[in-house]
Each structure stands twice: as structure tokens, then as C-alpha cells.
């Protein structure tokens, strides 16, 4: 699923985020990606999806090199960023337009998840609250049913009941064939649903273990 060896990346020559990072991750698990601000969590997610390009080393995801950004690869991965600039359109139109890029997109599931989150498809994404927008985007991400789903701080901006809904839908509406990586500072929000954790510190993996081992 994911193979990383000797990965190097820096935003400038003097600011290296990763120096020789190595990582192996198999298929079909929910992993919590942990670490303080500035440790490289978001950078790693973007490298895995081809939004940033490694400077050296090996990186293989789903049998593809993300650096090549092949359509067949991009259709199988999705990164839900912490912050998303949304257009002034309805949730339904956003789902329709963006879901068309993913062959695995399940429109019926998307609408079912909106109901669970108490959202109407006709709501304008620009005019709803931050928490509502976050839930709409989570519903879209899960409805894509991609083999590799990455989420950057998905519970930020959610109230306690919404966090419970998030845990429930993640457990209920993901399959054993999917691999999900969730970057978070709030591990207590996810400890009941994640299978393993990976902890980054100063651009290095200091812990990779199952939840039972931690």
C-alpha cells in the first residue's frame, strides 16, 4: 500500500522537514498520525498524495509514484485538508462536480451521510457554519470510497456531539479494503476507532505501533 524509503524533503535548503524517512503501511487500517505543530504531519500527507514532490528517496503508494501524478493514481486517493476554501454553491452541486473525478464515488452514500450530519444538500457551503462545512466535507470524503483516504485534523471545529457522529460514521461507513490516515492533535477523539499510531518528531518517526501496544 505505502512504501517510503530514504525520503527527503524541505521547503528551503536550510529547512529540511524529512531526512531519510522510512515507512511501511499495509492495506486496510485506520492510522492516527500524531505529532506537534511543525513536525511534518501535513507535509507527509501532501507527499503521499502528490501535492508536494519529494526531493530524493523512494515513495510508492498503491503501486504508483505520487510524483508522476497519474490520473489512475489520483482517482484512488483523497486528502481532506484542515482548511478548505469552498465556492458559493450548494452542497449537492459540490458533491456532483467533484465526485465526477472519482469512479468509486457513491452519491447515495453522500446523501445518507448528510442526513446523519443533519445537513440539507441544498445548503450553500459559503453560508453555513464552520462545523457544518467540516461535516459536509467529511461526508464527501467518505462517499468517495477511495482505497486511500487521508484527513488532516478532521475533528477541529466540531462540537462534542459532532465528534461522536464522526467516530460512528468512520467506523460504520468505511470498508476493510480502505486505508485511512488521520492527522490529529486530539488522539482522544479517535482512540476508539484507530488501529495504529505513527508519531512524528523533528521529521522522524519515533513510534509506529498498534493501539494495544502503545
What are the residue ranges of the model-derived segments?
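ABC-family P-loop ATPase nucleotide-binding domains
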Residues: 79-136
